């Protein structure tokens, strides 16, 4: 009789096949790098902490009939409670893919530079969040969990510092 090796359980786990991908799902999303000027005139960036404790920017799915710019504004309001904002420059697009059971999800996120206006201290995070906070720009860059968003944040900070804050179409 053959004795099982210590690796038999691992082999079974590794060799277990996932179901084949039966569909490709496209999920367009939009969000924003939200900033304000602190009392010392320093730039601060608003980050949210998701359910997995990763710091990121407010973003979400584009609804039917909605532009990416409108989505960015709506999602920022829903996720942060901020009502007054100025959606400025389009910073770029992030493509991300992941597997959801037997589907391949292709997510495209349009990111805008957004200036918070009015009372920016009255934040109302959604229930699923673990945190929401304004960070000095350098600290926000250290906290952000996603490299692609960090790159767009850097582009936004460059635009803020150069005064290149033209309104997008």
What annotation goes with each model-predicted range?
Residues 46-49:
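Short, acidic/hydrophobic/Gly-rich beta-strand patch recurrent on exposed beta strands
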Residues 2-38:
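Acidic, metal-coordinating catalytic segment for phosphate/diphosphate chemistry
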Residues 62-151:
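Unchanged
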Residues 56-59:
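A short gly/proline-enriched turn/hairpin at secondary-structure junctions
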Residues 27-30, 40, 52, 106-109:
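Short connector loops at helix/strand junctions that flank enzyme active sites
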Residues 13, 142-169:
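Charged phosphate-binding loop/patch that engages nucleotide di/tri-phosphates or the phosphate backbone
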Residues 31, 44, 131:
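Conserved beta-strand and immediately adjacent loop positions that scaffold enzyme active sites
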Residues 38-44, 101-104:
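Short, solvent-exposed loop/turn segments that connect beta-strands within catalytic domains
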């Amino acid at each position: 009789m053959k004795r099982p090796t210590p690796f038999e359980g691992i082999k079974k786990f590794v060799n277990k096949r996932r179901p084949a991908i039966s569909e490709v799902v496209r999920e367009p999303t939009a969000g924003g790098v939200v900033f304000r000027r602190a009392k010392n005139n320093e730039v601060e960036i608003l980050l949210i902490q998701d359910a997995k404790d990763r710091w990121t920017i407010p973003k979400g799915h584009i609804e039917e009939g909605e532009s990416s710019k409108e989505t960015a504004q709506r999602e920022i309001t829903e996720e942060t409670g901020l009502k007054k904002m100025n959606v400025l420059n389009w910073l770029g697009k992030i493509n991300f893919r992941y597997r959801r059971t037997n589907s391949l999800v292709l997510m495209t996120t349009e990111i805008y530079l957004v200036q918070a206006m009015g009372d920016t201290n009255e934040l109302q995070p959604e229930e699923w969040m673990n945190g929401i906070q304004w960070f000095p720009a350098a600290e926000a860059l250290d906290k952000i969990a996603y490299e692609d968003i960090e790159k767009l944040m850097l582009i936004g900070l460059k635009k803020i510092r150069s005064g290149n804050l033209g309104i997008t179409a």
